[in-house]
C-alpha cells in the first residue's frame, strides 16, 4: 500500500511539471512572435524611408539637370548680349571721341574768351580796390585822430590822479606831525603807563592761565584725533576684510557654478544608468526563464536517476513522455532559431541594398558637385565679361571727369580769390581789435598803479596807528576811529578793485566775443560759398547727364541763346545775378561755341562790400561800447577820489 501511495504522489508531481513546462513554452512562443512582428515592422519602415530618400534624390537630380540646362541657355544669351554690347560700346566710343574733340575745341575758345573777360574784370576790380583803399585810409586816419584825442584825455586824467596822490602825500606828512605831537604827550604820561603795566601784568597772568587751559583742551583734542585715527585704521581693516569676504563669496559662487555643472553631468550619468537598469530589468525575465528551463532540465535528470535507481516501469513511461515533450520543444526552438537566422539574413540583404543605394547617392552627389563647379565657372566668365564692360565705362567716365576737373579748377580759382579778399579784411580788423585791447590793458595797468599807491598809504596809516597804540593808551578812541576809517577805506578799495577787474573782464570778454563772432561769420560765409559751389557742380553734373541723352544740337543752341539773353537782360536791369543763371549759362557751353556772349561777373564784389559794411557797423558799435566803458571808469574813479577826500 505504501508503494502505491508513493507512485501516485510521483505521478501527481510529474503532471504538475508537464503543465508548467507547457505554459512556459507557450509564453516563449508568444514572446518570439511579438519580437518577430516588431522587427518586421521596423524593417518595413526602414525600407520605406530608403525608398522615399531615393525618390527625393532622383527628383533633386532632375531639378539640377533642369537648372544646368537653364544656366547653359542663360550663358549663351549673355554671350550674345556681350557681343552686342561690345559692338554698341565701340560705336558709342567713336561717337564720344568725336564729341570730345569738338568739346575740347570749344573749351579752348571759351578759355581764351574767359581770360580776356577776366583781365577786363581784374582791371575794373583793381580800380575799385584802389578807391576802397583810399576811403579806408581816410577812415583809419580819422579813427587815429580820435584815438589820439582820447589818449590826451587819458593823460589829463593821469595828471589829475598824480595831483590827488600829491595831496595824499601832504596828508601823510600832516599825520606824521601829529604822531610827533603824540610822542611828546607820551613822555608826560609814562606814569599812567606804569600803572597800566601792573594791570596788564595781572591780565597777562589771567591770559597765561587761559593759555594753559587751551593747551589742555588741545591735548584732549589730539587724543581724540588719535582715537579717530585708530577707528579709521579699524574701518580700513574692516573694509579689507569685506573685500576679502567678497573675493571668497566670488570663489564660492564659482564653486557653486562648478557644482551645478557637475550636477548636470551627474544627472546625465544617472539618466544613462537608469536606462541601462531599465534594459537590465527588461532582460531579467528572459534570464529567469532560461534559469527555470535549466532547473526543469536538472529536475528531469534527477528524476531519471531516481527512476533508474527504483527501476519502476511506470516511472520510465512517464519519463519517456516527458522526453518526447522536451524533444518537441527543442524542435520548436530549432525551428524558431532557423526563422531568426532567416530574418537575420534578410536584414543583411536589406543592409547590403542600403549600402548600394548609399553608394549610388554618393555618385549622384559627386555628379551634382561637378554640375555646381561648371555653374561656378560660368558665373566667373560672366563676372569677367561684366568687368570688361565696367572698365569700358570707367574709361568713358575718366574722360568726363577730366572735363569736370578743369571746370572745377576754374571755379576754385575764382572762389580762392574771393576768400583771399575776405581773409585780408578779417586780418585788418583783428589787428585793430588787438591794438584796442592793448590800449585797454594799459589803462587797466594805470588804474592798478593808483590802487597800489592807495594801498601803500593805507599800510602807512596802519603802522602809525600801531605806534600810537604802543605809546599812548589814552588816545585809544582816536586810534579806534582811525582803524574804522582805514577799514572803511580798505572795503572801498576792495570794491573798486573788484569793479575794475569786472570791467576789465567784461571788456576782454566783449573784445574776444567780437573777434570770435567775426571769425565765425567769416568761416560760415566761406562754408556757405563752398556749399554753393558744390551744389553748382552737382547741378552741372546732372545737366551734363541730361545733355548726353540729348542729341539735337539745334534745340540746345536755341536754349543757350535764350539763357544768355536772360542773363544780359538781368545785367541791363541791374538786378543781382543768381548762381542758377550763371550755372545755366556755363552748362551748354560744351556743345556750341558760336554766338557766345561775354559771361557775367561773379557776385564776390557785392558780398565783399556787404561784409565790409557789416564790419564797419560792428566796429562802430564796439567803439561806442568802449567809450561808454571808459566814461564809466572815469566816473567811478572820480567817485572814489571824492569819497577819499570827504573821508580825509
UniProtKB/Swiss-Prot annotation:
Residue list for modification Phosphoserine: 559
Coiled coil: 19-188, 222-555, 611-644
Cited InterPro entries: Cep63/Deup1_N
Keywords: Cell cycle, Cell division, Coiled coil, Cytoplasm, Cytoskeleton, DNA damage, Mitosis, Phosphoprotein
GO BP of this protein: cell division; centriole replication; de novo centriole assembly involved in multi-ciliated epithelial cell differentiation; DNA damage checkpoint signaling; signal transduction in response to DNA damage; spindle assembly
Compartments (UniProt record): Cytoplasm, Cytoskeleton, Microtubule organizing center, Centrosome, Centriole; Cytoplasm, Cytoskeleton, Microtubule organizing center, Centrosome
UniProt-listed Pfam families: CEP63
Gene Ontology, cellular component aspect: centriole; centrosome; cytoplasm; spindle pole
PTM annotation: Phosphorylation at Ser-559 by atm and atr promotes its delocalization from the centrosome and impairs its ability to promote centrosome dependent spindle assembly.
Source taxon at top rank: Eukaryota
SS bond list: none
Reported function: Required for normal spindle assembly. Plays a key role in mother-centriole-dependent centriole duplication. Plays a role in DNA damage response. Following DNA damage, such as double-strand breaks (DSBs), is removed from centrosomes; this leads to the inactivation of spindle assembly and delay in mitotic progression.
Matching PANTHER family: CENTROSOMAL PROTEIN OF 63 KDA, SARCOMA ANTIGEN NY-SAR-24/CYTOSKELETAL PROTEIN SOJO
Family: Belongs to the CEP63 family.
Record's protein name: Centrosomal protein of 63 kDa-B
Native source species: Xenopus laevis
Amino acid at each position: 500500500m505504501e508503494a502505491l501511495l508513493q507512485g501516485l504522489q510521483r505521478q501527481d508531481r510529474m503532471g504538475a511539471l508537464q503543465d508548467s513546462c507547457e505554459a512556459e513554452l507557450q509564453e516563449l512562443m508568444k514572446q518570439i512572435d511579438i519580437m518577430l512582428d516588431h522587427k518586421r515592422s521596423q524593417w518595413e519602415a526602414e525600407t520605406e524611408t530608403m525608398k522615399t530618400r531615393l525618390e527625393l534624390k532622383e527628383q533633386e537630380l532632375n531639378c539640377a539637370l533642369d537648372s544646368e540646362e537653364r544656366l547653359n541657355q542663360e550663358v549663351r544669351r549673355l554671350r550674345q548680349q556681350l557681343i552686342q554690347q561690345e559692338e554698341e560700346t565701340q560705336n558709342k566710343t567713336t561717337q564720344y571721341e568725336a564729341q570730345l574733340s569738338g568739346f575740347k575745341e570749344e573749351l579752348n575758345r571759351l578759355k581764351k574768351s574767359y581770360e580776356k573777360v577776366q583781365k577786363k574784370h581784374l582791371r575794373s576790380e583793381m580800380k575799385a580796390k584802389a578807391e576802397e583803399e583810399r576811403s579806408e585810409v581816410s577812415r583809419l586816419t580819422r579813427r587815429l585822430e580820435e584815438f589820439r584825442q582820447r589818449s590826451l584825455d587819458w593823460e589829463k586824467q593821469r595828471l589829475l590822479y598824480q595831483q590827488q596822490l600829491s595831496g595824499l602825500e601832504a596828508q601823510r606828512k600832516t599825520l606824521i606831525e601829529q604822531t610827533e605831537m603824540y610822542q611828546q604827550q607820551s613822555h608826560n604820561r609814562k606814569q599812567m603807563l606804569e600803572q597800566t603795566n601792573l594791570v596788564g601784568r595781572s591780565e597777562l597772568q589771567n591770559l597765561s592761565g587761559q593759555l594753559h587751559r587751551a593747551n589742555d583742551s588741545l591735548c584732549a583734542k589730539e587724543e581724540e584725533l588719535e582715537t579717530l585715527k585708530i577707528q579709521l585704521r579699524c574701518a580700513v581693516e574692516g573694509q579689507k576684510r569685506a573685500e576679502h569676504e567678497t573675493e571668497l563669496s566670488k570663489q564660492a559662487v564659482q564653486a557653486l557654478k562648478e557644482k551645478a555643472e557637475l550636477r548636470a553631468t551627474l544627472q546625465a550619468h544617472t539618466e544613462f544608468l537608469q536606462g541601462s537598469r531599465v534594459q537590465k530589468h527588461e532582460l531579467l525575465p528572459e534570464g529567469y526563464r532560461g534559469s527555470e528551463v535549466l532547473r526543469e532540465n536538472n529536475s528531469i535528470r534527477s528524476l531519471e536517476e531516481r527512476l533508474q535507481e527504483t527501476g519502476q516501469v511506470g516511472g520510465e513511461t512517464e519519463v519517456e513522455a516527458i522526453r518526447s515533450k522536451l524533444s518537441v520543444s527543442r524542435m520548436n526552438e530549432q525551428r524558431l532559431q532557423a526563422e531568426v537566422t532567416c530574418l537575420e539574413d534578410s536584414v543583411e540583404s536589406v543592409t547590403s541594398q542600403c549600402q548600394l543605394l548609399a553608394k549610388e547617392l554618393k555618385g549622384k552627389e559627386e555628379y551634382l558637385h561637378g554640375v555646381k563647379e561648371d555653374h561656378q565657372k560660368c558665373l566667373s566668365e560672366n563676372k569677367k565679361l561684366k568687368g570688361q564692360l565696367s572698365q569700358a565705362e570707367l574709361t568713358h567716365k575718366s574722360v568726363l571727369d577730366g572735363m569736370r576737373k578743369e571746370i572745377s579748377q576754374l571755379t576754385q580759382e575764382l572762389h580762392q580769390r574771393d576768400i583771399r579778399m575776405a581773409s585780408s579784411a578779417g586780418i585788418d580788423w583783428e589787428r585793430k581789435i588787438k591794438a584796442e585791447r592793448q590800449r585797454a590793458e594799459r589803462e587797466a595797468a594805470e588804474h592798478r598803479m593808483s590802487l597800489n599807491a592807495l594801498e601803500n598809504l593805507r599800510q602807512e596809516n596802519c603802522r602809525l596807528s600801531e605806534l600810537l597804540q604802543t605809546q599812548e593808551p589814552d588816545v585809544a578812541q582816536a586810534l579806534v576811529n582811525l582803524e574804522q576809517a582805514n577799514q572803511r577805506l580798505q572795503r572801498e578799495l576792495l570794491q573798486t578793485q573788484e569793479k575794475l577787474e569786472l570791467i576789465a573782464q567784461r571788456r576782454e570778454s566783449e573784445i574776444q566775443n567780437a573777434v570770435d563772432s567775426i571769425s565765425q561769420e567769416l568761416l560760415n560765409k566761406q562754408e556757405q560759398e563752398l556749399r554753393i559751389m558744390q551744389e553748382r557742380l552737382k547741378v552741372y553734373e546732372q545737366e551734363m547727364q541730361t545733355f548726353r541723352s540729348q542729341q539735337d544740337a539745334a534745340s540746345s543752341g536755341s536754349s543757350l541763346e535764350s539763357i544768355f539773353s536772360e542773363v544780359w537782360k538781368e545785367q541791363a536791369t541791374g538786378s543781382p545775378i543768381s548762381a542758377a543763371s550763371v550755372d545755366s549759362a556755363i552748362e551748354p557751353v560744351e556743345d556750341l561755341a558760336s554766338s557766345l556772349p561775354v559771361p557775367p561777373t561773379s557776385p564776390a564784389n557785392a558780398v565783399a562790400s556787404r561784409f565790409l559794411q557789416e564790419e564797419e557797423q560792428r566796429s562802430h558799435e564796439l567803439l561806442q561800447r568802449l567809450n561808454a566803458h571808459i566814461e564809466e571808469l572815469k566816473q567811478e574813479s572820480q567817485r572814489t577820489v571824492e569819497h577819499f577826500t570827504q573821508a580825509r
